[in-house]
Each structure stands twice: as C-alpha cells, then as structure tokens.
Amino acid sequence: DRSPWIHIPLGYGKHFSNAAVNWLYSTAANPEGLNRRVVQPRGKVLGGSSAINGMVYIRGHKEDYNQWRQLGNTGWSYEDVLPYFRKAEDQQRGEDEYHGVGGPLAVSDPYDKHPLAEAFIDAAEAAGHPRNDDFNGADQTGFGYSQWTMRNGRRSSTAVGYLKPARKRPNLTVATE
C-alpha cells in the first residue's frame, strides 16, 4: 500500500484498471445481462480490497445475521457480532449502543453533502420512504448517507488499521509473494 493514491480517496478511480494493485477480476458473461461481464475490483495489496474500494462502511442488515443464526450458525446473530463491530470501530460519532471508539477502523460521516444527493434523499422521503441517518444503527432501511472508512481525508484500510500498528512485532512476518 505504498502508492499515495491508495490513501487518498480521490485515487479510488485510479485502481479499477491498475494491475499492480487490482486482481482485475470480472464475472462470467451473463446472458440475461446482454452478455456483459461485470468488473469486480479486488485488492492485490496489503489491506486487500479495503485498500482500493469505495470506502463505504455498511455492516449489513441485522436480519441477515439473525437468519444465519437460525440456520444453525451459532455465534452469528446480530447480537453476537455487534460487540465485534463496536470493538473494530473508531467511530467519529462517538460511542453508543451500536458504535464503538478506539478501534483500529476509522469510521466517519461524509463531510460534504452534495445538493443533488440531498434532493434525492428528500425525494425518497417525500415518496414515503424513511430517511436513515445511521445505516449501522438500530435500522438498516431507508435513504440517507452511508458512513466511510476514512479520517482526516485519508483511507482507513485494514492494512492501516490492523497491520501498520503491529508491523514491528517480533512474531509477525509479512510475506507479499
């Protein structure tokens, strides 16, 4: 993750076709999709896809986790995994029932809300859809802004959050080939 473009959010688009940091995977041609192949960017750097993705922080719908538990996956209900989400976060909003602080992953709200995005959210609300100011809180449905894995204008990848603080440990060896 030595490229400055990995750490600067504006660099997001530079990685779609960069074989140095992206495995350049795509789906098989889909007959129902006009035989198109859909590009699936996957990170080929320390931090994996968290180093080249769009930095959107959404944990997933709590009912998905609860369904995994109902299918027999002990330890995977939303209540089971929520403490780990909270522990992983350094939430800009502060600590509460759904969010944690002090973790390795910086999570923040968008700092510049575009008028067109605001109009879209307002239109959804006017059409009867709920506005949601926290998709990682009590409810995951509705329209609103998602949070980012970014702090002070820099990406918070797993390499930055987890590996960088541990890189000098005597019991850690990082192999990249």
Predicted regions: what they are:
Residues 1-177:
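N-terminal redox-cofactor-binding region of secreted/periplasmic oxidoreductases
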